[in-house]
Every structure is written in structure tokens, then in C-alpha cells.
């Protein structure tokens, strides 16, 4: 007989009755019934009920003192449960093991929180004792689901002719849009490596190297603030790059991967290929967001022209100053109480708006509300037609400069869906957002900057860049850049790459980079492009966000084994921490006075 187990704790069936077995695991639950002690023994696979009887008083007494989460090995005989004690919720629920002896392999101290229920515990305590937290059923299952998803992704990609690569972790800093994690070089004083924000340049260089289809389950590092769907330190993505492809080639490759992946791990309805394509400007108009949740049936409409010559002075004057008006329908909401409309106004004010106008259309078509009296009968009819409003609906209005009005309308759309319970249930709705602006105005400097990935190919190529003379014309340029969105969550950005040095130099020059600076920062890639670079493109869906969706988790830390907390701290390993002066000296690093003072306190 094996030293620790002949079976796992999810394996024994009624056919095993009479067998002598050995099981090892954790004490999940213990129940003392006087002449009987029951112990639920748990391992990675499941739970088996162990019975200690008064036929062996010493053994039963020892079992009654077992602490939860102690590790024990039990030897005993499999017996059938009586009819009234069968537990059909457990695979082992038709049997139990009558204990003959047991060994405490490792006794547990008093637990900081309960393991055998999903009762919530303070997150800091959970993260500090993550090895305990990971024993809880939901979290344990999430980590197993993550493993299964990644394994299946590898199968899907390999079946489609992709080759898996590993790219460097120590590399140079690059402008992916977030702060780098920097690593000082001991051998090159004053110089620093950066942990990769993404394997962007390396995967493009692999295409230039003659490889055709690349993928990697890639670790990425960005010094960002935490959000519910974003870890503050590292994350993983399904990094993909392909040679000799158009944007549609990339879409048609990724869509079946997403469809097969989601249908494998959920019973919910999943969008079938081809996924809906929505240009960026259309998405901002209809949904007030570049990551729309298509489970929400509300479609926003532009009604600026209806209010341009109306008697509603506030909107009319706003329009004269260059603002717009967006209408956000609220289906079947006309009969809602006044408190509902007041709540929506308070929400808009909390989002920075001055208020939120609205109209209610009764079942008979009568228009009521603070805005209705300022519109003529014809204008009201035009409003209903433009915004697809029916009798019994209400409609809210957002008026501001284009970007602000669009964003407010988008937030109101989401709030209405929540308040009115409009989201379609049990489905995953995918879409592509395409034709992103190539440039944007930097809010801090007021200068032209890249809106997303600087390595994207501008639509129209070099000619489009050269013909755009004014700021307005530059801001109208679009890129072969796209996002894939599911249920309002951006899973990934991607792009057809700029593989021509002359276009890259011009694109960076418009954003204020000299040719020398481009060569300095991206010399390896620019040099490679001068030796024959294939047209190529790619995408990188986020593994963490995919797992979040499939696990129905609301927080990204629930699908990562050892996450950082919201302050980017690892409470289990006490990281980040201060290091000895000797190590700093070897790295030629000197702490600032304030950092030195903090270090001396530790």
C-alpha cells in the first residue's frame, strides 16, 4: 500500500465497498455525534466522509480533537451509507470510510478565517494567507479553470499553425502607454532594463525573421493603478502575430478561437462569427463608449439638429458654442416614479454634468417632463423617429462638447440598463471596434500624440500623413487598429503594423519625435525593417479578463493565484521590500533622502 494514499478523495464509489483504502487530505469539516465522529476529508479532487466509532474509543477521541485544515492520512474500510444518509451532491456520497487508524501529517494552527465556506473575509487577510484562501472551493476552481483555459488555448493555436515562442523578460523601455518596471544593471552602471509592457517589438521582429504565425502566453508588466479588471503589476495575454495578413484575415483567425474557447467553458450563448464590426466613431455615437456592452439594447442618437432651432434655450445656446445633444432612450420608463428621474439626474451630476434633461412619452403619446414644453409637436415627432422612441418610453439628454457628451451619454446608457434591468441574460456578445483615430490631442500638453499603438499602420499610408496639414485633419486620420470587446469588457487591442521605415519616421515626426530619437528608441526594429519586412499584424487578448468572464468573477484577484493588492503589494511575500545597502551599492543605486528615511524605519 502506498505511503499516503491508494485513492484520491473524489474517487471511491459503491463498487469499492469492502476495500481497504488509504486516503490523505485536509480536515474540511468535523461533526461530533457522541458515539460517532464524522470528518470530511478534502484533497485537490474532492471530499470523502470518514467515520470514527466508539468501537475504538481512543481513535474517536483523537479524531474529535482534530483541528480544521490539519493534514491527515486515514486507513480504513469502504462501507455503504445507509439510504437516509446518502449525499447525492458528492461523487463519493454513496459511501464512507470506516477509520481503522489515522496519522496527523501536519497539525494546523488556529485559522485566520473560515476555509470550508465561501463566507467573506477581509481581503488583506486573504492575501496574506493566500495558501489558505486557495483551498476554498470557488477560488480553487477558478485557478483550475484558468489552467484549463490556457491549455485549451494552446491546442487551438497549435491546430491553426501557430508556433509558440518565448521572448525576453529583460529588455529596453518602450512607449506602450504605461510606466515601466525598471531593473538596474550591475554590469552597466547607470543603465536600466525594463520588464516588457508587451512583447510588441519582439513579435514583430519574429515576423521579419521569417516566421509566419507566432503566439505566446505572454507575461506583461505595467506599473499601473489597480482596477477591478486590471492587476497593478503583471498580467498575461494571448499574444499573436501573423505575416502577410489584412485586418480581416486577423479577424477571421481570432473569431473561431474566441467562439470555441467560450463555448468550451460555458453553457451561455456566444456570438457566432463573424462578430459585429463597429467603427470607432459609430460606437461613440451609438453607445458612448469604445467598449460597448451589446447586451444592453439602448442605442444613443444624435439629436443636435432637432434642438438647434428649438425654444429650449440651454441646448440651443450650447449648440451655438459648438456643443451637441445626444438622446438616450429609456425603454418602458415613462411610468417610472419621480424618484427614478431624480436618481438619474443625481447620477449625471456625480459624473460631472450640470444635470440631465428628460421627456416622458405616455402610452397615449403625451409628452411630459422638463424639456417637453420647449419642443413643438413636429420636433417631438422628429425626436421619437430619430431616437427610435415609442409611447411608454422616456428619453434623457446629454449636451456638451462632443467627447464629453458622448461619454456622459454612454454612462447614462449603462446606468439605465442597470436600473431598468435591461441586460440580456446568459450570453457573451462579442464585437470588433475598428477605425480608431491614429492621433489624439494630449490633454496635458495640447500637442499631437499617438492615440494607441504607435506601431499601427495609418489608413492611407504615407500619402495620408503627408496630406494632413492641420491639427483637425491629423485628428481625422484613422489607423488599422481594432479592439475586441465582450460584454462591455475590452479583451484586447490589435493592429495591422506599420512595417515601412519611411511611414514610421513620418508618423513619429508628426508626434514630435526626431528621426534620431526614433532610431535610438526603436533602433532594432527600424534596422530590421530596412532589410525586408513582411506586412504583418496581430492582437493580444487578455488571459485574465477571459478567465474573469468565464469564471463570472467580479474582481481580477479572484482568478490569479498570487495577486498583488490594490496598493501593488504582495502581502504574503512582503514585496516590495527594502534591500541591504550592499545590494544597492553593487547596482550603483542611491536612495533619495525620503526613501532612505523610510528604509531606516523598517
Curated annotation (Swiss-Prot):
Binding site for L-aspartate: 176, 222, 452, 497
Enzyme class, broadest EC rank: ligase
Entries under Gene3D superfamilies matching the protein: Bira Bifunctional Protein, Domain 2, GAD-like domain, Nucleic acid-binding proteins
Entry GO CC: cytoplasm
Site residues (Important for tRNA non-discrimination), renumbered to this chain: 33
Binding site for ATP: 222-224, 490, 542-545
Subcellular location: Cytoplasm
Cleaved signal peptide residues: none
Any single GO BP term: aspartyl-tRNA aminoacylation
Protein name, as recorded: Aspartate--tRNA(Asp/Asn) ligase
